[in-house]
């Protein structure tokens, strides 16, 4: 199981495959950790948000076509649009939980059930294929690097969130609100906004995971991504 070798210039082995396939889950788990730390709740809609982000990204890249061999629009615009869409999904969840005080499980159940339908509307109910080598790098390999690219995404996400939690005021605020939201509010912290931000961040991280997942399969499949 732990044997690792290099074949065709890339690392090969069961442990590498497990870590590679778990990369999207790590990114999702980091976002859900922030949500749990701040609100004590969960976000069960992250899989659907992944599908929405993948659908938006691939639909822009394909220009509305079912399958393309070259980009019809800028990949930068596509990625930004996908992350904005996922942030909007997170903001919707955050508004329901932080502002309307709906139980997180119930609030996020809305996008859990409706999110894939939204993704299907974006792609017109079809699987959108992006057969471009540069798009495949996010879910494959960059150049001659033997380590799968998703592993780098997961590591970078872990490091950034760790630094935010341990080295910034926002991290302290999230911890304070999570421990005792009422006490945090009484000392001047905007508990509502902090909870809201954690859901937005969770949505963005789900969007990143969705882009990586779509890159793996060169397409946006709203039924299976996430």
Segments from the language model and where they lie:
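Alpha-helical transmembrane segments of multipass membrane proteins
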Residues: 30-34, 56-63, 91-95, 117, ...
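Mid-bilayer segments of alpha-helical transmembrane spans in multi-pass integral membrane proteins
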Residues: 56-59, 83-92, 113, 117-125
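Hydrophobic alpha-helical segments embedded in the membrane of multi-pass proteins
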Residues: 21-32, 52, 155, 159, ...
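Transmembrane helix-bundle core of multi-pass membrane transporters
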Residues: 100, 104-168, 194-197, 216-225
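Structural signature of hydrophobic alpha-helical transmembrane segments
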Residues: 14-25, 74-85, 151, 223-226
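Helix-loop-helix "hairpin" substructures at the membrane interface of multi-pass membrane proteins
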Residues: 74-78, 88-93, 145-221
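Alpha-helical transmembrane segments within multi-pass membrane transporters and channels
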Residues: 66-112
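Single transmembrane alpha-helix segments in multi-pass membrane proteins
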Residues: 2-3, 12-64, 97-102
């Amino acid at each position: 199981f732990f044997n690792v070798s290099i074949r065709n210039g890339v690392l090969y082995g069961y442990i590498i495959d497990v870590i590679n396939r778990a990369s999207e889950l790590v990114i999702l788990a980091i976002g859900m950790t922030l949500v749990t730390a701040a609100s004590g709740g969960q976000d069960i809609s992250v899989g659907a948000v992944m599908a929405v982000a993948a659908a938006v990204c691939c639909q822009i890249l394909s220009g509305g076509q079912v399958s393309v061999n070259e980009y019809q629009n800028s990949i930068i615009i596509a990625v930004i649009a996908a992350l904005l869409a996922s942030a909007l999904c997170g903001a919707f969840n955050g508004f329901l939980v932080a502002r309307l005080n709906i139980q997180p499980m119930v609030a996020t159940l809305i996008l859990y059930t409706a999110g894939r339908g939204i993704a299907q509307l974006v792609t017109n109910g079809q699987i959108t294929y992006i057969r471009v080598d540069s798009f495949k790098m996010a879910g494959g390999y960059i150049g001659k690097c033997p380590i799968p690219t998703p592993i780098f995404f997961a590591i970078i996400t872990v490091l950034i969130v760790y630094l935010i939690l341990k080295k910034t005021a926002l991290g302290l605020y999230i911890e304070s609100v999570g421990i005792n939201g009422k006490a945090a509010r009484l000392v001047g912290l905007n508990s509502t906004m902090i909870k809201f931000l954690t859901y937005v961040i969770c949505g963005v991280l789900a969007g990143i995971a969705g882009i990586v997942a779509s890159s793996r399969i060169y397409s946006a499949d709203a039924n299976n991504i996430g």
